[in-house]
Amino acid sequence: MDSNGSRLLEDLVHWSGELSELTRNARRSEPTSTVAFRRGHAVAAAEKVTVGLASPGQLVDWAQAVHFEDQVDVEEGHESLLTQFLVEVSTPELFEPVTREVCQRWLRVLQASLASDPETAGHY
């Protein structure tokens, strides 16, 4: 089993490190297991933009990389919300430009979803 490939994909989903290196490593890896993309990952990514740790363009690049990885599965029960987040953020030319305000709006939606889920309330 290629645990290193899965770890590299986990790093991308968690946006743990420099984005260009994460995307390059994820493209070169061949994970043998899937990695889950959860609401907490989307919250953390949107927060990076709202607090100034990442640019909106970086969020677009990250969302594209996550969205188009075959080995990334969306959190069960929240596929619609998370797929909508990835599609809208990864294709601003089809929806609206990604801005700090767009990220704040997504944060409210995602945090409300987490808060309404007894299993994740307070644990994202």
Please give the residue ranges for each predicted region.
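Acidic, Ser/Pro/Thr-rich low-complexity regulatory regions
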Residues: 1-124
